[in-house]
């Protein structure tokens, strides 16, 4: 992905400054908000990457959308604008979140279900992840109706698949490979 290396460098610098100013948590909240908003708004992403739109317009739009930003986050936006890198703002935000989580020993857990999870089930899953990994986790929920039921949990390179579709595939494979029943 274009700009990822630069985004990592900006994120590292922002995190370093935020740690020095004891604002890492507040900046993380800003970055989560920025990342979600830019990813969910194609128009905003297009505006940020457009060479036709003036930087002053981009800055005023960002400050209007994100009214309660930390001064460090505002400074980061200014630096990105000055360096002509505002188009990678969402990548910087994503990299900041990753680095912040690494710093705080928080792992990313991705749970895939056929239906949305309620808050109680999310809490149970997070406690199980903490029990299994020994570290805190943030939960990302993905809805995939193809798994039919159950769930698939991924934490780092570990995966636990308790989906109905997996069990059906396993059953199908066992029936096809059954040596006791002659092939019809």
Swiss-Prot record:
| Record carries keyword Membrane | yes
Which keywords does the record carry?
Answer: ATP synthesis, Cell membrane, CF(1), Hydrogen ion transport, Ion transport, Membrane, Transport
Which SUPFAM superfamilies does the protein's record reference? N-terminal domain of the delta subunit of the F1F0-ATP synthase
MF annotations from Gene Ontology: proton-transporting ATP synthase activity, rotational mechanism
Which GO CC terms are listed, alphabetically? Answer: plasma membrane; proton-transporting ATP synthase complex
Return the Pfam families for the record. Answer: OSCP
* Cellular location(s): Cell membrane
Q: Which domain of life is it from?
A: Bacteria
How is the protein disposed in the membrane? Peripheral membrane protein
What NCBIfam families does this protein map onto? ATP_synt_delta
> What is stated as this protein's family in its record?
Belongs to the ATPase delta chain family.
Task: Give the multimer and partner information.
Answer: F-type ATPases have 2 components, F(1) - the catalytic core - and F(0) - the membrane proton channel. F(1) has five subunits: alpha(3), beta(3), gamma(1), delta(1), epsilon(1). F(0) has three main subunits: a(1), b(2) and c(10-14). The alpha and beta chains form an alternating ring which encloses part of the gamma chain. F(1) is attached to F(0) by a central stalk formed by the gamma and epsilon chains, while a peripheral stalk is formed by the delta and b chains.
According to its UniProt entry, the function of this protein is described as: F(1)F(0) ATP synthase produces ATP from ADP in the presence of a proton or sodium gradient. F-type ATPases consist of two structural domains, F(1) containing the extramembraneous catalytic core and F(0) containing the membrane proton channel, linked together by a central stalk and a peripheral stalk. During catalysis, ATP synthesis in the catalytic domain of F(1) is coupled via a rotary mechanism of the central stalk subunits to proton translocation.
Q: This chain belongs to which protein, by name?
A: ATP synthase subunit delta
Which gene underlies this protein?
atpH
